[in-house]
Amino acid sequence: DGISKDLLDLMDEAETDTASHTGTSVYLAINYGGRLEITQAVNKLIAEGKTKITEDDISKNIYTYPECDLIIRPSGEQRLSNFLLWQAAYSEFWYSDVLWPDFKNEDLYQALREFEKRNRRFGG
């Protein structure tokens, strides 16, 4: 819902074209909601007959797996906005005042350089 057939076709084509790639993954969240993602994962597990649901069960049934290392938030906003709620648990965030349409390679490189300097503690 909310995405044109042409765009869906382009997204399917891009997914097919990159299916065999094994390097870095980039996820674009288009028409996405984190609460709905978690709800659908839990409902799927219930439909499969699960009576005790673990974190690992949910992780394996959400849209993206594995968890994200870095979440880049353009636009100057510093909030989750229902974005990757499950996957963001141990992610590092990088905020930019640059709007997404204006986001350039140099902005990405800056985010990656700063991420490289961080001491990730994964909740510890």
Regions found by a protein language model. Give the residues of each.
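Flexible, compositionally biased loop and terminal segments
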Residues: D1-G124
